[in-house]
Amino acid sequence: MYNLNALIDRLIEISINNNLIEDMDTVYTRNRLLSLFNENSYTPCEEKLTLSFHETLNELINIAIEKKIIEDALYSKDIFSSDIMNIFLPTPSLINKEFYKRYAISPKESTDYFYSLSKSSNYIRTDRIAKNINFKAPSKYGTMDITINLSKPEKDPKEIALARNSVKSNYPKCLLCIENEGYEGTVTHPDRANHRMIRLDLNDRTWMLQYSPYLYYNEHCIILSEDHVPMKIDISTFKNLLSFVDKFPHYFAGSNADLPIVGGSILSHEHYQGGNHRFPMNDAKKLFNFSIDGFEDVECEAIKWPISTIRLRGENIDSLVLASDLILKKWRDYSDETLDILAYSNSEMHNTITPMVRKEDGKFVVDLSLRNNRTSKEHPLGIFHPHEEVHHIKKENIGLIEVMGLAVLPGRLLKELEKIKEYLRDEISLDNIEEYHRPWALELKKKFDYLKSSTDLNDFVNKELSNKFVSVLEHCGVFKLNEEGLEGFKRFTNSLNS
């Protein structure tokens, strides 16, 4: 085991290099770290370590376990590591002052500062994110982004038992609330001692900007309401998203829908997602143009994308807000029984929108994906939701990130796809494949046996996985990209002028 003093010196050295602290802070920081380890003396160490940031942090955690300061459990190790890094961080007010000082130079400089801080303080878990499998694969709609999510570690049985028997608390109310800033964490609630948020004014309300601890794409940020209020899609959503992109034109911003099945995983707290990433949907081609009376300054088109999406372009924020709101209101009450689209069942609302906003070539671009959460006997989880035949790949809600063409697939697929590759190489029998994958594996075998002389196996499986994800998205499209669906899509866009 490494010497504690040497590890502390190494972490301080790394943090100075990462601009978390300055040389002047060395003695103070060292003493605060010693206190965490119940030590009240320090002897300089001749040994100079060259460990990486995460290696150093992990060795410090090992010492804390050895000294019985913490349990050897994931939640307590995470809490302790956040306590360590919190020592290196300024208070929220100081971080906000620095952010806006840099914002006066440029919006990008301010987000670069905050993103770097969030990584250097270990709030963004870059070590765990690095475990994800990411690749791009072609499809009939363009190149898709595929991620097999391996970043979130699984809890061990002991930790699950502790969580089951723990006292329930309503503080913080949810994972997004402002009360998470600096929160110690428990066995049931993640550590947030090293968590900081930037205060934003959007549409005369206070919002918070933070980065996701488990990034799915570059600079994946969350914009959350100061108040714990439910998700909603209305005219204020469009105002907020456009206001955010106006303030940070190098970022996109979007919202999950506000209804179950087609919404995100957290419907209880109003929030948006954003970041500095170009998604496959951004490059989707035009399907057809249309116009909306009274909005001559707004370009309108339907795009060729598996989830039925209207794209608006314009320079005037007010016009885009009003045009988006008109489309939302029309869609809320729109039914087309020939395509299984019903706006209401009794008093239950089914229609909503997944919106995204970005700035491109001096114009704002607003993408409005039309969603419907109705269920049926044939499709009890949702008519416009991944159907049973694709559940072996993805059965969870299709939210904003997936709508834009980035698949976030379960970690179990890593081993399961390797088995499928072994089957395609005739190394194992079909019985060794998980039962829910067998129909797909048989289908792949027929294709691969025909193509294998000219096709790389990994590329083949990646492309087929991408195609399966495209099927997931196609199931969610309310207007299918066939003759009947296109006619239906045009009936809806025509209704915008009635």
UniProtKB/Swiss-Prot annotation:
Record keywords: Transcription included?
A: no
The metabolic or biological pathway listed in the UniProt record of this protein is: Carbohydrate metabolism; galactose metabolism
Substrates-to-products reaction catalysed: alpha-D-galactose 1-phosphate + UDP-alpha-D-glucose = alpha-D-glucose 1-phosphate + UDP-alpha-D-galactose
Tell me the keywords, alphabetical order. Carbohydrate metabolism, Cytoplasm, Galactose metabolism, Nucleotidyltransferase, Transferase
Q: Which GO terms describe its molecular function?
A: UDP-glucose:hexose-1-phosphate uridylyltransferase activity
Q: Give EC number(s), comma-separated.
A: 2.7.7.12
Q: Which GO terms describe its biological process?
A: galactose metabolic process
Q: Which InterPro entries does UniProt cross-reference here?
A: GalP_uridyl_Trfase_II (IPR000766), GalP_uridyl_Trfase_II_CS (IPR023425), GalP_Utransf_C (IPR005850), GalP_Utransf_N (IPR005849)
Which compartment or compartments is the protein found in?
Cytoplasm
Q: Name any GO cellular component annotation.
A: cytoplasm
Q: What is its main location?
A: cytoplasm
Which residues constitute the signal peptide according to the record?
A: none
Q: What class of enzyme is it?
A: transferase
Q: Which family does it belong to?
A: Belongs to the galactose-1-phosphate uridylyltransferase type 2 family.
Q: What name does the UniProt record give this protein?
A: Galactose-1-phosphate uridylyltransferase
Its source organism is: Clostridium perfringens (strain ATCC 13124 / DSM 756 / JCM 1290 / NCIMB 6125 / NCTC 8237 / Type A)
